[in-house]
Design a protein with these regions (language model features):
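Residue-level recognition of tetratricopeptide repeat
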Residues: 25, 78, 110, 143-144, ...
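Start-of-helix register in tetratricopeptide repeats
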Residues: 71, 103-105, 135-137, 168, ...
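Canonical tetratricopeptide repeat
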Residues: 75, 107, 138-141, 172, ...
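Register position in tetratricopeptide repeats
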Residues: 82, 114, 144-148, 179, ...
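N-terminal leader/linker segments that initiate helical-solenoid repeat arrays
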Residues: 4-75, 82, 312, 316-317
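Short helix-capping/linker turns of helical repeat alpha-solenoids
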Residues: 68-69, 99-101, 132-134, 165-166, ...
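Single-residue signature of alpha-solenoid repeat helices
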Residues: 57-58, 89, 121, 155, ...
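Terminal, low-structured helical/coil segments at or just beyond the last alpha-helical repeat
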Residues: 242, 282-317
Length: 317
């Protein structure tokens, strides 16, 4: 345990840190007189609190209870990482991972990813998922570090192991299949998501059909999503408007590919009034150019330039 010198090289503790260290030693000694799990949990929480001000002192608290509380390994890993001691951080992250701490597994994956060690990054992100970490970021990184020209069987098997444990896994696997043009497998999973009332599942299925260039089915499913999206409201107005604008832009693309430029234009005009106006305007200008309507395209490009200038002025102010 580190006392009069810091845990980071040979930099001595400041007077304030020495005071915090003395208090930590006293509190830990008291805990050892009555070493119940409740007392050890209290020491762990105290370490989290103290490290906000005295980062290096947090280690003292965490190490005093880590044998009995595996989560302390994760906190030690985060603490060392925050001080730039990545090898020490990795040591504790791996230890926590081996003790079943999903947060530690994901953090080990994060460290390996930063070291550009993709194989180990994938290994630990998969381990985190197997331990029950179904956060969007973790699932995303499982398939990102499984990205190659060919689909990665290790990643597929990992997703399949967890397929019925969390619905987000099914969505992640469907997307992974779609990225590698395994359209039939992706379609099956997206249809299951539709039946399970997964949010935006109709849109996801519509986008899959766009990838397959089956624009009739894409239109069918995007319109089903439209019925849901435009028939209810959300407390977060900005969020619902962004969802609606995105759907309208997708429908516009489908209609453009089907040669129905009128419907494509109408959807883009609606989309630009909701959210991300610049995206709708950019698509609208291209649509007009495609039809040889160059004067209208120029007007839209002028509107787009003015929008960019307005945004720059807002940023400066």
């Amino acid at each position: 345990m580190c006392f009069l010198v810091s845990c980071s090289g040979n930099i001595p503790f400041s007077e304030d840190e020495k005071g915090a260290l003395k208090k930590a030693k006293t509190e830990i000694a008291e805990m050892k007189k009555n070493p119940t799990m409740a007392e050890k949990e209290r020491i762990l929480q105290k370490g989290l609190e103290v490290q906000k001000k005295y980062l290096r002192i947090g280690v003292v608290y965490f190490k005093s209870v880590e044998k009995d509380i595996p989560m302390a390994d994760y906190y030690l890993a985060r603490n060392y990482s925050a001080r730039g001691e990545n090898e020490e951080a990795l040591k504790w992250a791996r230890k926590g991972s081996n003790r079943g701490v999903k947060e530690a597994s994901a953090f080990a994956g994060h460290i390996y990813a930063n070291q550009r060690d993709e194989m180990n990054a994938r290994k630990y992100y998969i381990k985190a998922m197997d331990q029950g970490d179904y956060r969007e970021d973790t699932l995303f990184r499982v398939w990102v570090y499984g990205e190659r020209k060919e689909i990665n069987s290790e990643v597929v098997e990992a997703f399949k192991r967890n397929l019925n444990k969390n619905i987000e896994v099914k969505n992640a696997l469907a997307f992974y299949y779609q990225r590698h043009d395994y359209f039939d497998e992706a379609e099956k999973l997206y249809k299951e998501l539709v039946n399970e009332k997964y949010p935006n599942a109709e849109r996801l299925l519509g986008e899959l059909y766009m990838s397959k260039k089956d624009y009739d089915k894409a239109e069918e499913w995007l319109l089903k999503e439209s019925e849901n999206l435009f028939s209810h409201s959300e407390d977060n107005v900005k969020r619902i408007e962004e969802k609606r604008a995105r759907l309208l832009r997708l429908l516009a693309k489908v209609y453009e590919m089907k040669g129905d430029y009128g419907k494509a234009e109408n959807n883009l005009l609606k989309a630009k009034e909701l959210a991300h106006k610049e995206l709708a305007l950019t698509s609208l200008a291209k649509l007009y150019e495609k039809q040889g309507k160059y004067n209208q395209a120029l007007k839209i490009n002028d509107e787009l330039e003015e929008l960019k200038k307005t945004k720059k002025r807002k940023i400066k102010s």
